[in-house]
Amino acid sequence: HSPHLTAFALANQPLACRYEALLRRGQRSAVPVVPWAPRGSAAFTEGVGRAVERHAASWAVLLGNHGVLVFGSSPMAAAKFLVTLEEAAAAELRALALGGARDLPSGALADE
């Protein structure tokens, strides 16, 4: 598991889209959290399905009290996105020591 993303999942906190590299990977919104449910259960799959429907612009969902689920156009694209997400989560947590991360400028999250 990705340790920094897992911290967000354990806290049931979405990961804000503040890291510029996420934009380059196509992420333009916060990574949502799916409430905890036993893996493979109907509640789990329904929760993931609802999150994907509600947050169609997100390439990942955080699994409450568990970890992260990443999507991509290919396994390699998903793996690269996971690395970028983990970097973003680590940077967000480190930024807390400096007063917290700042949002990107207005319009930065708009589709180009």
Model-predicted segments: where are they?
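Glycine-rich flexible loops
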Residues: S2-E112
